[in-house]
Amino acid sequence: MAGQQFQYDDSGNTFFYFLTSFVGLIVIPATYYLWPRDQNAEQIRLKNIRKVYGRCMWYRLRLLKPQPNIIPTVKKIVLLAGWALFLFLAYKVSKTDREYQEYNPYEVLNLDPGATVAEIKKQYRLLSLKYHPDKGGDEVMFMRIAKAYAALTDEESRKNWEEFGNPDGPQATSFGIALPAWIVDQKNSILVLLVYGLAFMVILPVVVGSWWYRSIRYSGDQILIRTTQIYTYFVYKTRNMDMKRLIMVLAGASEFDPQYNKDATSRPTDNILIPQLIREIGSINLKKNEPPLTCPYSLKARVLLLSHLARMKIPETLEEDQQFMLKKCPALLQEMVNVICQLIVMARNREEREFRAPTLASLENCMKLSQMAVQGLQQFKSPLLQLPHIEEDNLRRVSNHKKYKIKTIQDLVSLKESDRHTLLHFLEDEKYEEVMAVLGSFPYVTMDIKSQVLDDEDSNNITVGSLVTVLVKLTRQTMAEVFEKEQSICAAEEQPAEDGQGETNKNRTKGGWQQKSKGPKKTAKSKKKKKPLKKKPTPVLLPQSKQQKQKQANGVVGNEAAVKEDEEEVSDKGSDSEEEETNRDSQSEKDDGSDRDSDREQDEKQNKDDEAEWQELQQSIQRKERALLETKSKITHPVYSLYFPEEKQEWWWLYIADRKEQTLISMPYHVCTLKDTEEVELKFPAPGKPGNYQYTVFLRSDSYMGLDQIKPLKLEVHEAKPVPENHPQWDTAIEGDEDQEDSEGFEDSFEEEEEEEEDDD
């Protein structure tokens, strides 16, 4: 058996293959994830939305005050250098000679495969004359030619070449290692050990340790775990939090503490500026000692948030701190919503009376505070202040108008263009157009609700203890799209009404006099209709003297006439009875036909119901698969916010609650992917008692005030189906056992009879 040899790369050819593949594995994914986004595309996007969002703070901070950032340039330089190295190594690999080539004697002799023996000998003579050492030729080349000639003419050499790929027989197997030989050289052993020790014993543990230390401090939503603990404690302590208490707890987050967050700063000037703002606000209680809510960092965050809600001007040294605090508020409020929901679930699972769940008002106040923080408005301010150029001074002209009395954004949008223009007459044309552009960009979301019980035979029948699934389909449109459609429909309806106004007046006048003239005609018609209802003619009564004379003169004739009248009456009665029988037969035939039609309709209806249930089942399966596989982007639509320092996307909270009992029925679902349409499933257990229940589905925005949607949800809960005591499957099993017992008894009796016969014999 041939020996095996392991050798390192002395020439460096195989090392280039390894190095090229290693650099490619780093450069290609890094380019995909780290290449800076095209700044021109971002500038074009900002230019397109300038008309609507031009007055927003986040827009002005991004566009009007661009800060030179060297990080994208550094990324591009590093990535381009990596690609240059990768291309150089690939070029180097393409130019390296192949050390291990398959031995082919035809190539050595410059012959085509399949040449005849005569051609081989002829070519060998020509090449041997050319490369023979005695005639000044190349000795190595001559040996290769002789070896190739022997491989093609000698039987043993040809057999070795066909089996082992070499005329000399099997050779030693060599394994190359794609590392340069100087790495394992004894002279460089200390240097190699130092590099390995530095990489795997110093750099790697430091990187992993620092990453682990930072990651264990944060939750999955990048919120400090200490902040979650603070929120859990104070939410449990104060189960019914008003807005003032909620702001106080929100400001106690560790994200604002410089000890836990390096981005949070504390300046010496805060000791002078913060007390001044406290005196201007005038509604901050400093007597309570409730750490960390009364710590300096928490007090500073609370003052900055209250000044933002009041739209107060603050010193420039505090503007940066206020912007940092406001950027953290949406995520912190979402964490507080999660904490409240977790405590509600814990209270339901525990039967202890001491564990008190937070109220529904606390949850809704968190959602309202998110809207307030984004828009920079206090709780009871008008939603119209979210629009540009509408401030406290001119708001009274809009809300206290004698004719319109606009209170909400929907009221303002629903007006006609002329009425809206007269209402906002105090605005210039450019400002009015800007207000209309912003107003038309506001979202208008509609909800379609359907409740059912999935994975059940009768999905529409809700029973006690079943898991109710409420499928909510959200459709998002802009205010401009919705009310333009409504106004176009109204205009289309009003135009033909105006065109035909004269004709309608004429018809009305005609109707007046036509009703008077038609009075007697109607009575005549009614009399005519009453005549066929009479079956017997009324007899004409004659005077008594005339009757006696007629009887005496025509006695027999009178009797015959009387007999004829009796026969006519009998014939009339017979015809009437025949007509009644025919009517009954036709009525029975109609009833039979109607029964058949009703049966067909029921069958068709049942088939349609089955098809609808099957389609719903398939759609639910597809929704689950999409939810598991698809990862939708959370970039929906930018929010119009005049005083928020960061571009925020439209997100929503969707949940079900009982307004009468003030309880939460289903946990809030944070809808972060609503661009046009979105389907959301809300699940909750059915009530424990049968009856009719009135719930409410809430859709609350986390960014806009006054755009929440509320829709009632009625549930009719029935008694749970009884557990079947007898089942056909069980009956078949019992019958099988009885048959087996009968067969066993029959076999026993047959054996007894055979034994008796043997005894008789």
UniProtKB/Swiss-Prot annotation:
Residues 518-537 have a biased composition (Basic residues). This is Translocation protein SEC63 homolog. PROSITE patterns: DNAJ_2 (PS50076). The keyword Endoplasmic reticulum applies. Residues 1-14, 91-188 are lumenal. One of its GO terms (biological process) is SRP-dependent cotranslational protein targeting to membrane. It comes from the Eukaryota. GO terms for molecular function: protein transmembrane transporter activity; RNA binding. The gene is SEC63. Gene3D superfamilies: 5' to 3' exonuclease, C-terminal subdomain, C2 domain, DnaJ domain, Sec63 N-terminal domain-like domain. Pfam families: DnaJ (PF00226), Sec63 (PF02889). The modification Phosphoserine is found at S743, S749. Keywords: Chaperone, Coiled coil, Endoplasmic reticulum, Membrane, Phosphoprotein, Protein transport, Repeat, Transmembrane, Transmembrane helix, Transport. Residues 36-69, 210-761 are cytoplasmic. It is a multi-pass membrane protein. It is found in: Endoplasmic reticulum membrane. Residues 197-542, 638-715 form the SEC63 domain. Residues 104-165 form the J domain. The ER translocon complex consists of channel-forming core components SEC61A1, SEC61B and SEC61G and different auxiliary components such as SEC62 and SEC63. Residues 598-636 form a coiled coil. Mediates cotranslational and post-translational transport of certain precursor polypeptides across endoplasmic reticulum (ER). Proposed to play an auxiliary role in recognition of precursors with short and apolar signal peptides. May cooperate with SEC62 and HSPA5/BiP to facilitate targeting of small presecretory proteins into the SEC61 channel-forming translocon complex, triggering channel opening for polypeptide translocation to the ER lumen. Required for efficient PKD1/Polycystin-1 biogenesis and trafficking to the plasma membrane of the primary cilia. Residues 583-609 have a biased composition (Basic and acidic residues).
